[in-house]
């Protein structure tokens, strides 16, 4: 508050907020040899100079030190707009991610109502991998595809449930390429166990341009070229877990952020920032039912986890059977998730584009690691849209440990 000068004895009025934040010191200048007051009971009218002095004891606390209100929520939409304002992402990416979050909300509702709406059980068809499609697999794929098409910002979409990538109609077409598994762990639906959706976002490949006069076969080939990019090219990746809470995990290359769906407002709210995977952990997540089919080196690794070791305690086994659920626990608690190759699945079971690359990108952004047992997953150049690879992902020390066993003579 600037110094103020008055020439009358009129009182100086302050608002309650100003009065609480400051006190007034008034200095009355006197001429040499004169008294402050002239005569008895009669005040002179000297110039009065008043200055506000900040009372540090009663001043409000700085914003950083102020306790955050329980109603001061940062929604996914608000967070995305902030990233756009700061130049981290562009407007098109904001719209694509918002469309994906909308699809996840719809799928979450379908999953919760599946037994009521008779959406459990199989559809009666198989997907391109020869797997029986659940009813919710088909519906979730349609929901995801429609949300991405109507966003007007995607050029090519590739789903685990579709034979080939699909070019979005020109009237709705955009630039981004989105790969996704609409409902991971759908075999758990009938038992109401955690499921999830996984996605990754790429820019178009420089080698691929679809001309206006391209034939259907040419468009398909160009779509495949566009989609078959290494995970190191990912611009964003994430997953949504449908469990006791609906959790949306996202990275745009600046760390991992966790949003939780608030059923009261129907919005994803930021609940964790810059998540970091512990450097090591004492939890392993493998389907040990396939132990007899594993390589001897992998068997030795698994046996080592069950020995007391230096800590005096063996590792704990935790396996849900849903990649999203098992990975989310691994990310928070540390440890390792693995789905290796075996005699039955020579190249592993998980898809590189839709599952392994996005999860490995998230893991690395959280300070972890993703490997196929011999090399970084994000460095693998896809040779087919539905290519499968082994996956070991989680804490850096745990992934490096299994790599040492697999590379031993």
Curated annotation (Swiss-Prot):
- Describe cofactor binding as the record notes it: Binds 3 Mg(2+) ions per subunit.
Compartment(s): Plastid, Chloroplast
Q: List positions binding Mg(2+) 1.
A: 131, 160
Q: What is its main location?
A: plastid
Transit peptide start and end: 1-49
Pathway, per UniProt? Carbohydrate biosynthesis; Calvin cycle
Please provide the record's keywords in A-Z order. Calvin cycle, Carbohydrate metabolism, Chloroplast, Disulfide bond, Hydrolase, Magnesium, Metal-binding, Plastid, Transit peptide
Tissue range of expression?
A: In photosynthetically active tissues, and in the shoot and root apical meristems.
CDD domains, alphabetized: FBPase
Q: Where does Mg(2+) 3 bind?
A: 181, 184, 355
Its EC number(s): 3.1.3.11
Q: Which cofactor does it need?
A: Mg(2+)
What cellular component terms from Gene Ontology apply here? Answer: chloroplast; cytoplasm; cytosol
Disulfide bond residue pairs? 223-228
MF GO annotations: fructose 1,6-bisphosphate 1-phosphatase activity; metal ion binding
Note the SUPFAM superfamilies from the entry.
Answer: Carbohydrate phosphatase (SSF56655)
Q: What induces it?
A: Light activation through pH changes, Mg(2+) levels and also by light-modulated reduction of essential disulfide groups via the ferredoxin-thioredoxin f system.
Subunit structure, interactors included: Homotetramer.
Protein family according to the UniProt entry: Belongs to the FBPase class 1 family.
Kindly give the HAMAP family that the UniProt entry links to this protein: FBPase_class1
| Protein name as it appears in the record | Fructose-1,6-bisphosphatase, chloroplastic
